[in-house]
Swiss-Prot record:
PANTHER family: 40S RIBOSOMAL PROTEIN S14/30S RIBOSOMAL PROTEIN S11. Located on the platform of the 30S subunit. Part of the 30S ribosomal subunit. GO terms for biological process: translation. This is Small ribosomal subunit protein uS11. The keyword Ion transport does not apply. NCBIfam families: arch_S11P (TIGR03628), PRK09607.1 (NF007176). One of its GO terms (molecular function) is rRNA binding. It comes from Halobacterium salinarum (strain ATCC 700922 / JCM 11081 / NRC-1) (Halobacterium halobium). GO terms for cellular component: cytosolic small ribosomal subunit. Pfam families: Ribosomal_S11 (PF00411).
């Protein structure tokens, strides 16, 4: 007996200035819902905060559950490249809020871009 529940992919781009969340179908071709930190908080400094990520995740979960998606795989992305490899403060809060809002979490995957010896990093990067 096959499981007929629909899966989606929750893309969480968490930088230190903003957090952007998008939910797509399994192929990633069709966007089902999207939100960013600036759409849920007033202050620019709060866009990357865990509170903003929680509010965004609750909104997205509500929209996606209405469309019939019950389970999601989460793809977390940090700034990457020559910037930080670690995601911003909103990433963990977003995953927790998605689970708390009624979505079942499948896989959690880190898709931060890592250069294969790309351009020279800035001299004050601290690596």
């Amino acid at each position: 007996m096959a499981d007929d529940t629909k899966w989606g992919i929750a893309h969480v781009h968490a930088s230190f200035n903003n957090t952007i969340m998008t939910v797509t179908d399994q192929t990633g071709a069709e966007t089902l819902a999207k939100s960013s930190g600036g759409s849920v908080v007033k202050q620019n400094r709060d866009e990357a905060s865990p509170y903003a990520a929680m509010q965004m995740a609750e909104q997205l979960a509500e929209e996606v559950l209405d469309q019939g998606i019950e389970k999601v795989h989460v793809r977390v992305r940090g700034p990457g490249g020559n910037l930080q490899r670690s995601p911003g403060p909103g990433a963990q809060a977003a995953i927790r809020a998605l689970a708390r809002a009624g979505l079942e979490i499948g896989r959690i995957e880190d898709v931060t871009p890592i250069p294969h010896d790309g351009t020279r990093p800035p001299k004050n990067s601290g690596y």
